C-alpha cells in the first residue's frame, strides 16, 4: 500500500524520468523493488498530470516520452532517467553518465530484408531504412559499404515491401514482427540492447550518495 514516509531518507530532492508506454510497468516494478512507490494517480490513465509524488517527500517521478528523457537529463530538468541503450549509441553521450544497465526491454539491433541472405557486392549503393541514422552509417562505413539512409520513425518494416529501401536496420525483440512482414533477420549488429539508467554529470556529482543508494541497496 502506498504511504508517505514521515522521515526522509536524504535531504536532496530527486526527480526521476519514467518512460511512458510499454516499458512503464517494468520501470515502476524496478523502482518498487528498491522501495519507491508511486502515488495512486500515477496508474490512472484518465488523469493528465505528468508529475507525481512518491512515498518519499523529496522524490518526484515525471512521465515522459522515451525520446524526450535524454534531453530532460542533459538540461537538468530530471536527475535520473530510464532510456534505451540504443538511444545512447545513436546520440552523443556527452554530459551523460551511464549509471546502470538493466534487463528491462532486452532486445537487439539487426539488419533485416526480404531475402534470406544479403549480397553486399550486388550494388554500389544500398538504401537503408532506419531511425538509427548514426548507428547505421557508422556500421556500414566500417565495412566499406556505401549506403543511403532513409530516416523513418515508424512502420520501418514496410520500407522493403514498398520499395523504399533494400533493407532495414531496427530493434528486434522476438522477431515476430519481422516474420509477420515477410522479412528475414540477416545480421545482428548489437545483441546487448536494454533499458539503461542515466544521469547528468552535475546531478550525479551533487546527488551521488542518494542516487547510489536508490540503485543499489534501495531506499
What is each PLM-predicted segment?
Residues 2-219:
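Domain-level signature for soluble enzymes in the chorismate/prephenate branch of the shikimate pathway
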